[in-house]
C-alpha cells in the first residue's frame, strides 16, 4: 500500500505523519510505502522543521533524512491513499488534481478517527514546542487507527499499485 501525507509546506505536520505511519507499518510487519508532500513549494528540498525533528526524536523516530517536495497531480497515479492534514490543504489538492481527483482516494487525516467531522491537524509552525507535541499525539493516534483499519486484510503484506491487482510479496 502506498500512502501520501500532505500538509501546506511539508516541513512540520506531514513529515511527522510520514515518519509515524511508516514506523507503525514496519512494526506491524506491513510492506507499506509512506511519503509526504506539501501543497506549496516554498520549502522544496528542505529537511523537516527542527521542532518536528526534535519531537520525532523524543519519540524514537528519525525524520531528519526527509526532504520537502511539492504535491503534484501525478501523485494520484502513484498513491493508493492520500491524506490531507487540513481542509485548506484538501481544497488545494482538489485544485492541483483537477480531473484526476478521486474522492475515494483522498480524505482528511482526522476523518479516520472522527468520520465526517472534517477536523484539521493544527499547523504548529508559528507556535512554541508544546504545539508540536500536541500535533505528534494527534497524528500518532490516527496512525494507530489506519494500521488497524488497513491491516485487517488477511494478507497484510500485499502491495497494491495503481492499476494493478493486489499481489503477495
Language model feature labels by segment:
Residues 1-78, 148-158, 166-169:
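Conserved active-site segments centered on acidic
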Residues 7, 56, 83-84, 139:
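Hydrophobic structural packing positions in well-ordered secondary structure
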Residues 14, 86-87:
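Helix N-cap/beta->alpha junction signal
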Residues 81, 87-163, 168-169:
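Phosphate-binding/catalytic loops
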Amino acid at each position: 500500500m502506498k500512502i501520501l501525507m500532505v500538509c501546506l509546506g511539508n516541513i512540520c505536520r506531514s513529515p511527522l505523519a510520514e515518519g509515524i505511519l511508516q514506523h507503525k507499518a514496519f512494526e506491524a510487519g506491513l510492506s507499506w510505502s509512506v511519503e509526504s508532500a506539501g501543497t506549496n513549494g516554498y520549502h522544496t528540498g528542505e529537511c523537516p522543521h527542527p521542532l518536528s525533528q526534535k519531537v520525532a526524536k523524543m519519540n524514537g523516530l528519525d525524520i531528519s533524512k526527509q526532504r520537502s517536495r511539492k504535491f503534484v497531480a501525478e501523485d494520484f497515479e502513484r498513491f493508493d491513499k492520500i491524506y490531507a492534514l487540513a481542509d485548506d490543504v484538501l481544497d488545494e489538492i482538489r485544485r492541483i488534481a483537477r480531473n484526476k481527483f478521486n474522492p475515494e482516494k483522498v480524505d482528511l487525516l482526522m476523518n479516520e478517527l472522527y468520520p465526517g467531522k472534517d477536523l484539521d491537524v493544527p499547523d504548529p509552525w508559528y507556535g512554541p514546542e508544546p504545539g508540536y507535541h500536541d500535533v505528534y499525539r494527534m497524528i500518532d493516534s490516527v496512525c494507530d487507527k489506519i494500521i488497524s483499519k488497513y491491516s485487517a486484510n488477511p494478507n497484510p503484506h500485499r502491495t497494491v499499485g495503481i492499476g494493478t491487482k493486489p499481489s503477495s510479496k
